[in-house]
Structure formats: C-alpha cells, structure tokens
C-alpha cells in the first residue's frame, strides 16, 4: 500500500468524523507497492446517505488541507452491480 502512516491517519480521522460506522477502502494503483504515482482512490461503504454530497465535499477539503493538493477520488456504495464497486470491494485495502 502506497500511503504514508500520516496519510492513512488523516484519511481515517476525517472519515470517522464525517462518516461514522462506515468502511473506507483504498483501491486502484495505490494498493500496488510496485507502481508509482497515481491518485488516491477511495471507496466508502456507509448506510447513512443523509447530506452525502456536503459531507463528501467537507471530507475532501479537510483531507486536501492536511495533505496538500492531491488528486483524490471518493466513491460511495450506491449500486453493488457497478463494476467499480465490485473491484474496490474485491481488491481494495480497508483503512
């Protein structure tokens, strides 16, 4: 996994604050230690869909404030038939 301990802490801190009782996964190229670069792809499983867009924007702004301007993609569990959700669940690393 190509996240520093600090990056891991920041992601989980803001996730727990804004999306309690949820599961956050890192997926995509950052899960492969042999690859370089790449954005931070996150998959979030949550049952609480209230104010989801506002909480997503708040999460991304707080993470970028703490980590600097990085490309971060955050997707939610919406439809388990979506290929991206299946890939994230199968190959993702829970944070």
Where in this protein do the model-derived segments appear?
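Catalytic core of pol beta-like nucleotidyltransferases
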Residues: 1-25, 31-37, 46-95
């Amino acid at each position: 996994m190509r996240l520093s301990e600090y990056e891991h802490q920041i992601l989980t801190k803001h996730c727990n604050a804004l999306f309690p009782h949820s599961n956050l996964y890192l997926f995509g190229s950052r899960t492969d230690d042999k690859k370089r670069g790449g954005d931070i792809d996150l998959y979030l499983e949550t049952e609480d869909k209230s104010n989801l867009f506002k909480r997503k924007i708040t999460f991304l702004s707080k993470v970028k404030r703490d980590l600097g301007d990085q490309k971060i993609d955050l997707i939610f569990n919406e439809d388990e038939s979506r290929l991206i959700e299946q890939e994230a669940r199968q190959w993702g690393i829970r944070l």
